[in-house]
Amino acid sequence: MCLIVFAWKAHPRYSLVLAANRDEVFDRPSARLDYWDDHPDVLGGRDIEKGGTWFATNVDGRWAAVTNFRESQPAAPSSWSRGHLVSGYVASQASAAEYARDISEPLPRYSGCNLLVGDAQALFYASNRDQRHTGARIEKLSPGVHGLSNHLLNTPWPKVQRCKRSLQALLGAGKSGISDDLFHLLADRTPANDEELPATGVSHTRERMLSSPFIVSKGYGTRASTVLLVDNDGTCVMQERSFGSDGIELARRTKTFRRTDRRN
C-alpha cells in the first residue's frame, strides 16, 4: 500500500474503519481481492511475483498492511519481500502482540517499510526506518484516527493530512453507510501545492505526481482502492476497486464475513 487512513476503536459502530490505496507499476502481476487457495481463511489481493500481499485479513479478524518507505535508492534485488510480512501474519496463528514481538528482530533486514498488524484486541505499528530507534520501532497504537503513507506513521504529508481530515469529518457526520464516502476520499487526484511537497530524494516532478491520494501516471499508479469495515459485533466487510493504467475503474469486489472465534 502507499496510503492508509484508519480509525481504530474511534467510532460507536465500527471497531475499525480503514481505507487504503495500493500504488504499483502496472506490469507487476497481481491477483484481485479473494480468498486464497493455499490459505482459505485469508482474504486479500496477492502479489503473483513474490507471493506476498500488501493488505489482507484472516476470517478470525486478524489483518495486516504494509507500505514501502520512500527512499532515493531503489530496493536491492536481493531484499526480502516486504509483502511476506503481511502474508506471514495472516496465514499464521499469532496474535497481533505476538507477531509484533517476533518481527522486531528480522524487520531491519527488509528494505524500508511500515507495517500494521491488528486483531480484535490490539493494533501495532512497526517500522525499520525510524532513526530515533535502534533496529525496529514497534508501537502499540491508541484508539484514534491515523494516517500512513511512504514515511513514518502520521507524518504530515499533504495527502495524509487531507485524507485524515476527510475521515474524521465522515466519522463525525454519523452516517450509517460510509463505504462510498471512503472510496471518494481515496479517489482524490489533486496534487499538493509545490510549497507543501516533502523532500524525499526523488525529482520535483515525481514528488508532485506522488502527492495526490490517487495517482495516475504512465506505467505506475493506483491499481486498487480497498475499504475494510469491522463492526463491533464482528461483521467484516472488505471491498476493493481495481483500476487500469489510465485510472479507469476495471472491477469491484465485496466480501462479507462474520469474524470467527478461533483467535478472537
Regions found by a protein language model. Give the residues of each.
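N-terminal nucleophile
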Residues: 1-264
